């Protein structure tokens, strides 16, 4: 549907959940159902601790996760969920959120990873593994997230 449509409608239990272009729905889903329905999604849940300009900080699994401000604003002390698509992050040796590699699998055109931060499992796809270090199961590394690629629900 996404490849041949100008607009699509996502329905949940017979009710329109979201209508828009494929890009709008993929990058700006209205809720977890739509985000999960339209593609692979990771849900990073945390409490807002800081708001500064266009960004906020969520306390996520004991770490600080910078996110773009949600449309309509955000409030300190309130719980939010940030949607992270598997292709919107990569692994590195430092500079991000410390994580542990649970799964590392070469898939041909990409390296598939499952990493854990606290109790949260995060799925990643590194679409250029030949030019980067490949992390193995059991290794500790750093999850590098492009802040502006996150979408806060």
Language-model-detected regions and their locations in the chain:
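Non-catalytic connector elements of ABC transporters
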Residues: 41, 51-153
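Internal alpha/beta loop-helix hairpins
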Residues: 2-63
